[in-house]
């Protein structure tokens, strides 16, 4: 699979993070979509069917843990990889992320 065939959804409420990370992923040839909150991230995930979702934990409204849980309960997204990309590095936050169905947990 070429990078251009690999679809990534980036979900973060910080515009600077969305811009920086999506720019660098696109520069490497990946197809990238973005969402600025959990609700729009879930909606885009259902429409876009990405291979990978990079998800922030701390977001207003539906946080990343709930978003991950909702994604995992959507059958057409069962093969999508989910990695939290977040400033929260505490053990309890990582455990909550993995319990919600995350495949990886990366601290910013």
Model region roles, listed by residue range:
Residues 19-27:
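Charged docking surfaces used in two-component/phosphorelay signaling
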Residues 29-36, 44:
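Short hydrophobic/Thr-rich beta-strand motif most characteristic of the beta2 strand and flanking loop
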Residues 36-40, 63-66:
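Acidic catalytic/metal-coordinating carboxylates
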Residues 43, 65-78:
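Short amphipathic alpha-helix used as the core "switch/output" element in two-component signaling
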Residues 48-54:
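Active-site beta3 strand of CheY-like receiver
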Residues 59:
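Receiver (REC) domain active-site loop signature in two-component systems and cognate sites
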């Amino acid at each position: 699979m070429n990078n251009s065939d690999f679809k990534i959804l980036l979900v973060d409420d910080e515009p600077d993070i969305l811009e920086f990370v999506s720019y660098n992923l696109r520069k490497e040839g990946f197809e990238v979509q973005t969402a600025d909150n959990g609700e729009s991230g879930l909606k885009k995930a259902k429409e876009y069917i990405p291979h990978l979702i990079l998800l922030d934990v701390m977001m207003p409204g539906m946080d990343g843990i709930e978003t991950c849980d909702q994604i995992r309960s959507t059958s057409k997204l069962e093969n999508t990889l989910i990695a939290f990309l977040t400033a929260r590095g505490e053990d309890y936050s990582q455990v909550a992320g993995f319990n919600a169905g995350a495949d990886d947990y990366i601290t910013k």
